[in-house]
Amino acid sequence: MEIQINTLAAETFLALYSSAGWEPPCIGQIETALQNSIAAFTAYDGGRAVGMVRLIGDGGMSFYIKDFAVIPEYRSKGVGTLLLRALEAYIRGRIPADWAVSLELISTIEAVPFYKKTGFEERPCEWDGPGMFKMLRPEGKGENDGIS
């Protein structure tokens, strides 16, 4: 298994994203997201892309895990752990050793045990409230069309 950094093409992203069962955005939106990511990590097995994760954030205090996907036949085989280790090493290699930074994400229900096993805490917890999420959709295309 090989982890590559910043080689993820939009078409590969689309295939991996779709393998997770998520409705994919258009190629233009994917290209913009990849260009504006801090880094993108792709797991390859013999040249075949089998997993990915993007890192976004401010580069100093807060980092966010986005679009973490592993194709179904490679799940529970260590691919996600390898991707996460590469992502964490990347962050640690780019910040001063005495900085504490947050690494955040929104998990699917099914992935909660994986994240807990790798050191993440569910929210709410004793010291923090729940994570929040809001999808901004095109005007007139669904809920949350604006602030009331």
Language model regions located:
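Short amphipathic alpha-helix that is part of the acyltransferase structural core
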Residues: 1-28, 145-148
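Short alpha-helical
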Residues: 8-12, 60, 109-113
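A short helix-loop-beta-strand connector motif used in the catalytic cores of GNAT acetyltransferases and
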Residues: 32-42, 99-101
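Conserved beta-strand in the GNAT
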Residues: 42, 48-57, 61-64, 69
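Conserved acetyl-CoA pyrophosphate-binding loop and the N-cap/start of the following alpha-helix
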Residues: 74, 78-86
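Conserved active-site alpha-helix within GNAT-family acetyltransferase domains
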Residues: 93-134
